[in-house]
Amino acid sequence: DGPLRPGVEGIVAERGLADRVLFLGDRKDVAALYQAMDMFLLPSLYEGLPMVGVEAQCAGLPLVCSKEVTDEVSIGEATFLPLETSARQWAHQVSQALERGRDLGLRAQGEEMTRTAGFDITHEADRLAHRYQALAEW
């Protein structure tokens, strides 16, 4: 959500896509929404490390994003494209991501990919506890 939402909603309506595009606003049930998706598209202009991309992959979704997104977002299956790439090529990459997601069984691998990439709360808590212990013993 943001100040551009009404304009984007207008564009969607003008193009006859209102029955295919949902604007859901702020949600507390994002994990359930990820389970209803087949892949995640993130064509962002300005991003550092978008946690939404990490979360989507944790849910086992293949990710297609712009090259403006940092490489660190990739914990498994991410494709990066320049924003200047044609809509046809973006659509092709989305199609490829959907196929890869099915072929690799990403849903079942999401939790392991998360842990391997270091986005695991238990691992991070242990690491922080060890650092504090080392400081206390210093």
Locations of regions flagged by a protein language model:
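A short hydrophobic beta-strand element within the catalytic core of glycosyltransferases
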Residues: F40-L41
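Short hydrophobic beta-strand element within catalytic cores of glycosyltransferases
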Residues: P62-S66
